[in-house]
């Protein structure tokens, strides 16, 4: 009976404590000022924003959940340790004090140290893996190539790099908090500073112990997962390249295997864990034995006295009686002064009255009247010293029903976490660099033959005629991050039973397409159950979706006679980050088109050197531009001037009568109309700013040409959004509700079409580039002279283009350079039509050649569109113009326009020089004609065979050899 009363006492005390805390909180809230409540609310909001910032920072480093939650656990443990030490030292800490101080402590201190340490560890791990990859490519075997050594290296290097900085920050913060604890300021500042100092101390310890261990485990788990994903499919596929590499390295692997231990590489994680457990058990027993002289409770009196004195120094009284009695003292003092007599006042400690139910006193009385259980419990463990009393206290606390449930939950979580950690340690035992079995050369040869002669599988119930076997295309290089772009198709058992159409449709309705084979998905798609455009969204695997779409197109009866070889064509589709394409750049994807990219230069533009990336299939184009760059650099480089920056959009609106259309035109041309439209347009974007509007009337149709800046984006979508809103404001607020919007784009822009309006009024960026080439450089590098170039430019670029009625085409080949740079940097290739508008002017300036190009409608951007793709973004990186400019939006796009203008200048200079010297045809015959043996991969007609046979006669070969030598010497002289 006594035992039950003891058990029932704890829940009542907990409920009473919660009730008291809630009532104190309500009293505090009622008596608090509005400003204090607002400050506390802002503090809590800032604290939660700090948590969000922590998870966002960890997400950028590759951890969506675990590192962030482990950081919070580490900080919570540090706070609990600090709270225990503070209360044991006699410093009173209330819930109100914690609720008021913790948000500001979290916001002030934050989790920057954990983020800094994590970033350093990850960067050193990536650096270590890159060094390993370089060594493996060069044939070197690194002695520290294992995952465990990589993690050890990353942690040690990170601590060496950032350890002093972290310790310094901790020391400064703890010193400041100690000063606050010793300041003597009342109101809870001393107690909270004391608690915060201990919390930071334990946070420092846990950062380099608990959190570092979790970080190492996370790194090991990530590396093990990546290795298992990459190694397992390669073993199953047994491709030709893997077979050759393994066969060539068989002797070396045997040598390594001979030096390795019998059971593979040893993983020291589990043995170390066992040793630490045994040492901990021994340490507990040693402490228990050493505590025998101190089993007398009186021997601890000194420590208790010191702790209580320290608590008395730091902790003031919980209630200040003079503050409570301030109202009474204020009333007594004037009375004493008026009566002119001394008054003695005694201030007593306030008494707090609480209303409780009588049942509480009955329960407390029954428990207090039967202390036999408590006395027996303490008497039983009294003779066992400090360790015995500690164990006794723990056993007694287990009798609390609430606490026991939490302990069971904690034990369950501990078991689950330990199981996960042991699995991670078990993964580390196997070394992925050492094969698990002997390599059978016969099996490798059979696998090679299988890969070389693999035939396509037929769809269900449909026959497709076989196609001639083609050579296996080379594997394209990985263009994006391997961790993001590598998608392996799930292996399918070869002996899987065929499912009926009803079963397949049932799986489709259950969204279980991942359980189907490729042939089953193809069958459903060809029967119209899965739309071909929705394969990526339906399958959830972009690479597999592209592969299946190729097979579907190859088997489509409408064009099977010409597309039957698509699924085995040399158009690559693997090892590409298709997520960037989806919903942004292309639909119905069947692969990607590798395009050669070269660089021309370096070219000095406005005092800075650039290498110009150019994606082209035209021979000698990059070489010609490089020769022009060399000549321009010899004259001091190119100078550019930006003359305009404004993208245009020309909508078409209509009215019922010409009178209304004319009134609308006059209103748009007026100052009031301009102001209203500009205000409406500018409200749609923080980058788009309307510069001007130009109107034209054709009958009852009114064309309005909006011209606006668009930041670093090319801006077509941005300006279209602004035009729609401005026209809506014009109809509703401008008094033209009878206006009918025919089209947002009325070809008055003019976009992707040759138009005199773009040539006259400009569109996009307007750029003029100039260079002065000394006469000696013209003769030595360009193999021409100044007067010949000036004469050729007038006759060809000026008079010749005028005779042809050209609009903006007064140049030699500006579109060549513009198109190549557009493809390399992710610009819109269709806008080469107006972007290549250019006039080239040459003059003889005191014996030197002065050349300039003027391009009034260059439409480029460094943000959005094709620039989101990693290869194109990499080309923008080498120009230093990727993305939006951090301080002045629009500068990156304007700099790209200057670079393109200077590159066009180099191309114009080189081509005109080649034309003047008569080198153009010979250079193209040398570099821009494919060799005859390239026809061997494509079946040709009998006519092609006759031509090929004629070209291979001994006489033709002898003549070609002489021509080749002569052309090579001439082109080499041109390039030099």
Swiss-Prot record:
Residues 943-953 have a biased composition (Basic and acidic residues). Residues 928-941 have a biased composition (Polar residues). Residues 58-64, 112-169, 215-272, 423-976 are cytoplasmic. It is a multi-pass membrane protein. Keywords: Endoplasmic reticulum, Lipid biosynthesis, Lipid metabolism, Membrane, NADP, Oxidoreductase, Steroid biosynthesis, Steroid metabolism, Sterol biosynthesis, Sterol metabolism, Transmembrane, Transmembrane helix. One of its GO terms (cellular component) is endoplasmic reticulum membrane. Pathway: Metabolic intermediate biosynthesis; (R)-mevalonate biosynthesis; (R)-mevalonate from acetyl-CoA: step 3/3. The active site is at residues 618, 752, 828, 924. It is an enzyme of class 1 (oxidoreductase). Gene3D superfamilies: 3-hydroxy-3-methylglutaryl-coenzyme A Reductase, Chain A, domain 2, HMGR, N-terminal domain, Hydroxymethylglutaryl-CoA reductase, class I/II, NAD/NADP-binding domain. GO terms for biological process: coenzyme A metabolic process; ergosterol biosynthetic process; isoprenoid biosynthetic process. Residues 926-954 are annotated as: Disordered. The keyword Transmembrane helix applies. Its EC number is 1.1.1.34. InterPro entries: HMG_CoA_Rdtase (IPR002202), HMG_CoA_Rdtase_cat_sf (IPR023074), HMG_CoA_Rdtase_CS (IPR023076), HMG_CoA_Rdtase_eu_arc (IPR004554), HMG_CoA_Rdtase_N (IPR023282), HMG_CoA_Rdtase_NAD(P)-bd_sf (IPR009023), HMG_CoA_Rdtase_sub-bd_dom_sf (IPR009029), HMGCR/SNAP/NPC1-like_SSD (IPR053958). Signal peptide: none annotated. Residues 1-36, 86-90, 191-193, 294-401 are lumenal. CoA binds at residues 624-630, 781-783, 923-924. It catalyses: (R)-mevalonate + 2 NADP(+) + CoA = (3S)-3-hydroxy-3-methylglutaryl-CoA + 2 NADPH + 2 H(+). GO terms for molecular function: hydroxymethylglutaryl-CoA reductase (NADPH) activity. Residues 36-217 form the SSD domain. HMG-CoA reductase; part of the first module of ergosterol biosynthesis pathway that includes the early steps of the pathway, conserved across all eukaryotes, and which results in the formation of mevalonate from acetyl-coenzyme A (acetyl-CoA). In this module, the cytosolic acetyl-CoA acetyltransferase catalyzes the formation of acetoacetyl-CoA. The hydroxymethylglutaryl-CoA synthase then condenses acetyl-CoA with acetoacetyl-CoA to form HMG-CoA. The rate-limiting step of the early module is the reduction to mevalonate by the 3-hydroxy-3-methylglutaryl-coenzyme A (HMG-CoA) reductase HMGR. Belongs to the HMG-CoA reductase family. This is 3-hydroxy-3-methylglutaryl-coenzyme A reductase.
